[in-house]
């Protein structure tokens, strides 16, 4: 056999003079369940829209009162009391979490008692207790330092701040405690070996690492605080729900103003949910190799998949 014949490839499928390979035709998977569920959801939404459109609701009033000065003032007060109460709750949460983990049995017991009491009683009851505290103590007397009537000290804002902030502090204490305990004890031991004090170790080593565990539930707590703040309308604080209810009672548009309040609550929670999402991504950078896609990245990926499906057809 000569070299020419040895170098010639054997005849077979796809060679010259034979039937060429056929291109593979990819058939996309049909997700019939998704289409069925989408139709069911669309029908239910259509039914709800139709039901509300036929009800005795003046939708023009909703649009007219959406930016009413009283409503916007109540909206601002809602944000102020929510941020203030959350800040107080966060400070108290860190303090009582550290006390709870202390080796001192007295401070640990005091922290446990605080958490047990404020988590075990409804926040609405706590607000009413603060609001009616003047029935028990007519004066707040600190001796030569300060003395004043309780009614003058416990304004609606102070009542709302104490009621929401102290209650939130109990929940934040458990969240912070779980975050601190998630950090390996070797980190603290190494810090002590380097000569750091307990407070320096907590501030520079433990808490920064614990933030990955603390941030997600803290964001949820703040969003919940925005909605829980509606309870302070019972103690005369002029927040969003109270402002809307006052207008609704005066104008005879109670349901319309409840819809106005709901729209603003949804707007606030949506805005802060986006902020929470990106804050979680920031603190997840050191723990995840690949960060979860953002909503815009998911939308882009879905559009690309849809285009590839159309091309395949």
List where the protein language model places each region.
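Transmembrane alpha-helices and adjacent helix-loop boundaries
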Residues: 1-313
């Amino acid at each position: 056999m000569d070299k020419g014949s040895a170098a010639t490839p054997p005849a077979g499928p796809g060679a010259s003079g034979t039937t060429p390979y056929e291109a593979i035709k990819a058939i996309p998977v049909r997700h019939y369940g998704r289409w069925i569920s989408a139709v069911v959801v669309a029908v239910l939404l259509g039914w709800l829209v139709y039901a509300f459109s036929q009800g005795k609701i003046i939708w023009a009033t909703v649009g007219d009162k959406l930016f009413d000065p009283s409503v916007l003032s109540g909206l601002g007060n809602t944000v102020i009391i929510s941020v203030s109460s959350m800040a107080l709750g966060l400070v108290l949460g860190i303090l009582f979490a550290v006390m709870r983990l202390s080796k001192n049995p007295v401070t640990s017991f005091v922290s446990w008692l605080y958490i047990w009491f404020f988590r075990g009683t409804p926040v609405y009851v706590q607000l009413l207790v603060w609001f009616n505290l003047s029935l028990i103590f007519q004066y707040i007397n600190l001796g030569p330092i300060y003395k004043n009537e309780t009614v003058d000290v416990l304004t609606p804002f102070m009542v709302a701040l104490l009621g929401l902030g102290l209650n939130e502090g109990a929940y934040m204490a458990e969240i912070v405690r779980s975050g601190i305990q998630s950090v390996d004890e070797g980190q603290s031991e190494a810090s002590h070996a380097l000569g750091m004090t307990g407070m320096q170790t907590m501030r520079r080593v433990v808490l920064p690492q614990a933030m990955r565990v603390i941030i997600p539930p803290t964001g949820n707590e703040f969003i919940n605080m925005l909605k829980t703040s509606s309870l302070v309308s019972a103690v005369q604080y002029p927040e969003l729900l109270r402002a809307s209810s006052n207008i609704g009672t005066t104008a005879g548009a109670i349901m319309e103003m409840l819809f106005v309040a709901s729209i603003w609550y949804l707007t606030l929670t949506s805005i802060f949910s986006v902020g929470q999402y990106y804050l979680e991504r920031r603190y997840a950078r050191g723990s995840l190799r690949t960060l979860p896609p953002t909503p815009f990245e998911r939308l882009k990926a879905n559009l690309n998949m849809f285009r590839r499906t159309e091309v395949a057809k």
